[in-house]
Amino acid sequence: MSIQENVESPQYPGDDTRPTSKRELAGWYCYGWAAEVFVVCAMGSFLPITLEQMARDRGVLLSDKTTPCSATWRPPLPPPGSDAPVYLPQVSDGGQCIIYFLGAEINTASFALYTFSLSVLVQAVIIISMSGAADHGTYRKKLLIVFAFIGSIATMLFLVVVPKVYLLGGLLAIISNTCFGASFVLLNSFLPVLVRHHPSLKESEEVASPDDNVTGPRGDPLFSSTGDIDRTNVDDSTPLLGPNREAGKTSAATITSLELRLSTRISSYGIGIGYIGAVILQVISILVVVVVRPPTFSLRLVLFLIGLWWFVFTIPASLWLRTRPGPPLLDSGGKPLHSWTGYMVYAWKSLGKTVTRARQLKDIVIFLAAWFLLSDGIATVSGTAVLFAKTQLNMKPAALGLINVIVMLAGVFGAFSWSYISNFFNLRASQTIIACIILFELIPLYGLLGFIPAVQRVGLGLHQPWEMYPLGALYGLVMGGLSSYCRSFFGQLIPPGYEAAFYALYAITDKGSSIFGPAIVGAITDRYGEIRPAFVFLAVLIFVPLPLMLLVDVDRGKRDAVALGAELDGIPQGSEYGAISDDQTTEDPIEE
C-alpha cells in the first residue's frame, strides 16, 4: 500500500479525510483573531486592573484599616476586636488597600491574583474533563463554540458589575478565563489535523520531479526536488542524507520535516493574526480609558468591548471550521457512547494512562518540564514588570498601556519573522526556541544590573521609565517566537488521534505553572521590601529550561508518539498506518 493511499484511507468510521481548505484555515485564524484579545487586552492589562479597582473602591487603607480608599463610600466598622482607630473622613489616593473577606484581610492587588489562581484550577479540571469528548466523536468544534460564547458573554457582563458586588466580578473573571483556556486547547487540537490533511503535504508524498518544487502556503518552497532538500529549511527531523530517488517516494523523515515546518508556519500566522487584532483593540481600549469617566466605569466598558469583539468574530470561525470528527468512543457493548459522564470518566482514565506511560514519551516529558518552567517565567515576568514599573518607576496607566502596545507590535513581528530568521541562520526548531530563551534571559539580567553602583550612576539597570519600552519590545519579540514554535514543536510529539488530550496537558502545564512564580515573587518582595531582588529568581527560572530543550529529540519523540498511539488504539505494530481491519476497535470499550 502506498503512502498516498495510507493518507487518504479513513482511519475510523466517519473520518473526514478531505484536504484542508483555505476557508477552513481562515476559520482557524479567525478564532485566534477573536479570542487572542482576551488574553492580551483583558488578562494582560484591564481585567486585573478592573478587579483591583473595584476592590479598592470597597477597601480601606492598610495603614489604619479605617480610612476608605475611595471617596464614594463609607466603610463599615472594623471586625470586633480590631484595634483600628476611629473613622476619619479623609481619602488617600496612595497606600496599600485591603478588603475583608470571610473575616480575613486581603490586599486589593492580591484579590486579582487569587481570582486568577482559582480560575487556573477550575480551568485545569474543565480541560481534562472535556478532553475525551474533544478527541472522540463530533464534539471538538461544538465545545469550542460553546466555550467561546460563554466566555465572551461573561466578559461583556462586566459592564453591569459595580464595586458593591465586586465578588461577582471575580466570578465572571473565573468563568471567562476558564472558557478562554478551554477553547484555545480545542483550537490547538485542530492544528495537527489541519497540517495532516494540508494539500502541500499530500503533494509531497508523491514522487517529486527534479524540476518541480512542492510549495507550501503563499508559494514558499517547503522542500526542493527529491534528493535535494532545501538546506535553508533543515530542522530537527530532516535526514542527514536526501531521500532515495530509487525508492519512488518521499521518505517518512522528510514528511515529518515538512509537517514541522508547515505546522510552525500556520501556528506563526495564527499568533501574528491574533496579536494584530489585540493591538487594534488595545489602542481603542486605551482611548476609552483616557476619555471616559469615572475610571471604574471606563475599565468595565473596555471589558465589554473585549467580550463583544470575542463574540462577534467567533461567528465566522464557527461557520468556516469543519467538524473534523475524531474516532467514536465505544461503550462496553461496542456501541457509540453518548453519555457525558462516560466521556468524563474516560477523559480522566485516559489522563491516568497517559501519565503511567510517560516513560514511553521521554521527549514529551522533557519538553513539558521545560515548558512548565518557561511558561511560568513568561507569566511571572509580565506581571512583575508591570508591578515594578508602577510601584518603583512610578509610571502612569497610559504609559503602562503603551508598553503593552509595544509588546504586542513586537509580538506580531516576532510571530511572522522568526521562521525567516531561523531559515536565514539555518536553525533547527529546537535551536530557535533556545535562541528565544537566551534573549528572554536578558530581561532579568538587565534588571540585576541595577544593583551595580557604576550602572546606577549612569541611570541604567531599570532606574528610568524609558528603559521599560525597549525591554517590552524584546519581551514581545521573544513571545512571538516562543508562542508559535513551542506550540507547533509540541504538536509533532503527540500521538496521532490524541491531539486534544495532549494539548490539554500542554495547557495545564502552561496555565498551572503560573500559580507558583507570582507567589514566589510576592514572598521575595515581602521579605526585602522591593521587587528588584526577585529578578534573581526570574533569571534562574528562565535559564533552567535551556538545557532541558537541548535534550529533546524530535525524531525519537515522533517515533515514540506513533508507537504509543498505536498501542492506545489497539493497532498491531506491524499493521499499516491508516488501515482499518474488520475486527479492529477504535478504543478500548468502557462501561457507560
UniProtKB/Swiss-Prot annotation:
Organism: Penicillium rubens (strain ATCC 28089 / DSM 1075 / NRRL 1951 / Wisconsin 54-1255) (Penicillium chrysogenum)
Homology family: Belongs to the ATG22 family.
Signal peptide span: none
Function: Vacuolar effluxer which mediate the efflux of amino acids resulting from autophagic degradation. The release of autophagic amino acids allows the maintenance of protein synthesis and viability during nitrogen starvation.
Protein's recorded name: Autophagy-related protein 22-1
InterPro entries documented for this protein: Atg22, Atg22-like, ATG22/LtaA_families, MFS_trans_sf
Gene Ontology CC entries for this record: vacuolar membrane
Keywords: Amino-acid transport, Autophagy, Glycoprotein, Membrane, Transmembrane, Transmembrane helix, Transport, Vacuole
Positions annotated with a glycan in the UniProt record: N213
Membrane topology: Multi-pass membrane protein
Location of this chain's protein in the cell: Vacuole membrane
Pfam family name, one: ATG22
Membrane-spanning intervals of the chain: 31-51, 108-128, 143-163, 167-187, 271-291, 301-321, 364-384, 398-418, 433-453, 468-490, 502-524, 534-554
The gene coding this protein: atg22-1
